[in-house]
UniProtKB/Swiss-Prot annotation:
Family as reported in the entry's similarity comment: Belongs to the SUA5 family. TsaC subfamily.
Keywords, ordered alphabetically: ATP-binding, Cytoplasm, Nucleotide-binding, Nucleotidyltransferase, Transferase, tRNA processing
Enzymatic class: transferase
SUPFAM superfamilies: YrdC/RibB
Protein's name in the database: Threonylcarbamoyl-AMP synthase
Principal location class: cytoplasm
Record domain YrdC-like: where: 6-189
Keyword Metal-binding in record: no
Source organism of this protein record: Photorhabdus laumondii subsp. laumondii (strain DSM 15139 / CIP 105565 / TT01)
GO cellular-component term (any): cytoplasm
Annotated InterPro entries: DHBP_synth_RibB-like_a/b_dom (IPR017945), Sua5-like_dom (IPR006070), TC-AMP_synthase (IPR023535), TC-AMP_synthase_SUA5 (IPR050156)
Gene Ontology BP terms: regulation of translational fidelity; tRNA threonylcarbamoyladenosine modification
């Protein structure tokens, strides 16, 4: 990975720093993302998606350390952590107890947070350059299929947000979602 970002990459980073929503490719579909610490940006994302805040959101990161400020992982056993780390980096999202200080705009009505360490090269690079995880939800309007190309993002959202152009990974389905405490499967991947 280069230590310098391209101009297109820089424009997406600038948008993140300005508390804007961006679109970017992930393992299966394009995602909408923003700075998880910006209530303004998260609210903008929720409005774009027509998604109620109570549902909570997913954080996507380059590495587990980026997620730790939001998580109360001391509630997990070594065995539970081992199961989680065996799936990362990769397309499995784990629901983990959140720190009490984790913003409600991320956790929604829950005391947990859904998190994933991505293996998509552009996601990894984006989180590395930005220095923290991103909120990640599929790029699609309510009732429409998730976007798989930058052009589909433009068709659904117009010019409302900057797009990091690139290919999605080879997966057909969105990430699997599992509960780290119970192992329960919430969504098949």
């Amino acid at each position: 990975m280069s230590n310098e970002a391209s101009p297109a990459f820089e424009s997406v980073l600038t948008a993140l720093k300005a508390e804007k929503v961006i679109a970017y490719p992930t393992e299966a579909v394009f995602g909408l993302g923003c700075d998880p610490d910006s209530e303004k940006a998260v609210n903008e994302l929720l409005i774009l998606k027509k998604r109620p805040w109570q549902k909570g959101l997913i954080l996507i990161a380059d590495n587990y350390e980026q997620l730790q400020p939001y998580l109360d992982d001391k509630l997990l056993t070594e065995e539970q952590k081992k199961a989680m780390f065996a799936c990362w980096p990769g397309p499995v999202t784990w629901v983990i107890p959140a720190k009490f200080s984790a913003p409600k705009w991320l956790t929604g009505q829950f005391a947990t947070l859904a998190v994933r360490v991505s293996d998509h090269p552009l996601v990894k690079q984006l989180c590395t350059f930005y220095g923290k995880p991103l909120v990640s939800t599929s790029a699609n309007l309510n009732g429409l299929e998730p976007c798989r190309t930058a052009e589909e993002v433009r068709q659904q959202f117009g010019d409302k947000l900057p797009i990091l152009n690139g290919d999605v990974g080879g997966r057909k389905n969105p990430s699997e979602i599992r509960d780290a405490l119970t192992g329960e499967l919430y969504r098949q991947g």
